[in-house]
Design a protein with these regions (language model features):
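Conserved GNAT acetyl-CoA-binding A-motif
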Residues: 108-120
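A short helix-loop-beta-strand connector motif used in the catalytic cores of GNAT acetyltransferases and
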Residues: 50-60, 69
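Conserved GNAT-fold acetyl-CoA-binding loop/helix
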Residues: 24-51
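A short beta-loop-alpha structural element at the N-terminal edge
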Residues: 9-24
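Conserved beta-strand-loop-alpha-helix junction that forms the acyl-donor binding cleft
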Residues: 89-92, 117-127, 143-150
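Conserved acetyl-CoA-binding loop-helix of GNAT-fold acetyltransferases
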Residues: 93-106, 128-132
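Conserved beta-strand in the GNAT
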Residues: 66-74, 81-86
Length: 162
């Protein structure tokens, strides 16, 4: 069931105390897809979250005080990278992802920099959703697809689907 009302989400900076929750959420949502393309390496995954938290590039998404996902992006000199958007399984399909990515799209627009992301080709639900909200495929090696947000696309608005 899709929620059509906008949820009152909050975003806060991830801190070192969030590392285990970030890792667990990533593992629950992404392990199967990652293992289809790469070897799942828990040490590498944990190290990646520790680095993103140290750099201040990861935000926890909360709704009614409950952690329901996280979004990780990096601003580079000529673009914005959406490194990861992850919503806990029981909170998916409630527009949380749509609102979280809208925050990053707004940042990209304000900075006048294109928004890029990588999506695993085997993660068809994510791939299809990114296409639906206006991302275009610019590179695909059969395992990982690089996509860019095309703000001129007629479908380049975030609907209530994520």
């Amino acid at each position: 069931m899709h929620c059509t009302a906008v949820m009152d989400l909050s975003f806060r900076q991830a801190i070192s105390g969030d590392l285990e929750w970030l890792f667990d959420t990533d593992k629950r949502t992404m392990r199967v897809a990652v293992a289809q393309v790469y070897v799942w390496d828990e040490d590498s995954q944990r190290a990646g979250f520790a680095k993103s938290v140290r750099q201040g590039a990861c935000q926890i998404v909360t709704w009614e005080g409950k952690q329901c996902g996280f979004v990780h992006w990096e601003v580079e000199p000529d673009l914005v990278w959406l490194r990861m958007l992850c919503i806990v399984p029981d909170m998916q399909h409630k527009s949380i992802g749509s609102q979280a990515i809208a925050k990053v799209m707004s940042l990209s627009s304000r900075l006048k920099k294109p928004l890029y992301l990588h999506v695993l080709v085997c993660n068809r639900a994510a791939y299809d959703w990114y296409r639906k909200i206006g991302f275009v495929e610019i590179e695909n090696d059969g395992r990982v697809c690089t996509m860019m947000f095309d703000s001129s696309s007629p479908s380049g608005t975030v609907g209530q689907h994520g």
